[in-house]
Amino acid sequence: GLGDVYKRQRPDTQLYIMDALERYIHDFSSPEEELLHELDRQTHLQVVQPRMLSGHIQGKLLELLVRMLRPRNILEIGTFTGYSALCMAAGLEEDGVLDTVEVDDELEEFAASFFRRSPHGQKIRQHIGSALDIVPTLGYTFDLVFIDGDKREYPDYYRMLMGDGGSKVLVHSGSILIADNILWSGKIVEPVAHNDRHTQALLEFNRMI
């Protein structure tokens, strides 16, 4: 099959194909908004590990999903610099609320500065700290959850949302759960080192869902 052909290709060929596919998708997508373009650029200039930013294609997909699903309450675990939050907020109806949680307090003002400049920023409630501590206190049942936080905590995020241990269930039967990086650049199908907690946690999370 095509998967076997792809696996037999040299790594540099695989990278070329992935880059070409990304350019192709970009060419057939709506243009990136000016504020988001600036956010992307400033993230690459000022922030460590800028590749963690969702980016234009993923952002447009998230916005589209929000427009289609029409959630009232969205939870994002892992704000980073705020790109994905702004994209989801753009698709959110005016009376909707997006709670976004980031553990790194050094990113708080960076993201907040772009939220303030966006016409959709008033829909966003920004929280700094551990999602496992903050989310249960928010008082919402969430219609849509986007998980893009610490990969080692993905199983704990899921248990929290499902109310394991007798705590309140934070989702309902029609809620949508979106989790980023669950294939982890293919590491989930390779031998896993005993100290690779990120991949181990993602494997556990994938089995749970």
Task: Name what the model sees in each region.
Residues 8-75:
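Class I SAM-dependent transferase core
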Residues 1-6:
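Short, small-residue-biased leader/transition segments that mark boundaries at the very start
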